[in-house]
Amino acid sequence: MALGAASASNKMIDGDDVTLDAQVATVRIGNHLQIFNGTVGVSRRANIVKKAGRGAEMAYLKGKKMLELKRNIEAMIVSPTQVAIAATTSVAGQSGGLGVQLVSNPLHNGAGATAAWTSGAPTAAITAGTNRTFTKALLDTACQNIYTTSGQFAEMLVVSPAHKALFSAFASVAQNRMDVKSGKNAQATVVGGADVYLSDFGGLTVVPHYLMASSDTAYVLNSDYIDLAFLDGFKTTDLAKTGDSDKVLITADCALAVRAPTAQAKITNLTP
C-alpha cells in the first residue's frame, strides 16, 4: 500500500466544502510459479530386501528427493540473478529470486543496476557492476534506506559464509574476549564472530547461507513481507507401472513473493 507524501500543513477551514483527493490506482506486482520436480524409481526386489540403515527403499528415496527439492527452492530464493519466466506450452515457468525483486533499495557499484519493477513479474536481468569490499558503512546505509522508504526496521542480514566472516571483523562489532566463568580457575573465551548487529535503524540477526558461497550479494530483509507462496504444496504422485518397479513423481509448485520491496534492501557487487 503506497501512501501519499506526509504534509505537516494539511488543514482546512471549519465548515468549508471539499474536493476529492486524486486517487492512485493500485498496481499489482507478481511473480511466476516454478514447478520443482524430481522422480524416484525402485525395483520390486530393492523395496523388499533388507538394507543397512533404513527400511523401505522407496520411503528413503522419497525423503531424500524432498530434501533435494527444498534445497533447490532455497537456491531460487537467494539467487541474485534468477529472473521470472512466464510458463508456455514449451517453456517451463520460473520464479524470480530475491535479487530481481529487491528493487527499492539496491546498493550497486560501478555500472551495476537492478531494473525497475512496478507491475507484473520481475523479468529484467541484473546489470553487472564492479566488485568492492563489504563494509559496515554499506550495511548502515542499507538499514537507513529501508527505514527512509518504508518506516520499517530491518531484522535480518543474509550473507555468504565469506561475508559473514568479514562482518564479524567490522570495527566495533565484536569484542575480542569475554569471561564466561568466575572463580580461581576462570577461563576466557575468544569471541571470533558476531550473530546480531544493532544498527541505528533496527537490530539485525546475521545469517550465513551455504548456498550463497560464491555470491556477490548481501540481503537486508524484513521477513514480515516475504513469503514462499505454494500452489498446492509438496505433492507425491504414483506413476503408471511399466515393468517390475515402482515410480513416483514429486513436485513443489511455488514462487517467491516479496510483498513490500521498500522494506528490504540488497548490497551487491561485493567481492565474493
Enumerate the predicted regions with their spans.
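Flexible, glycine/threonine- and acidic-rich loop/arm segments that mediate assembly and lattice contacts
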Residues: M1-P272
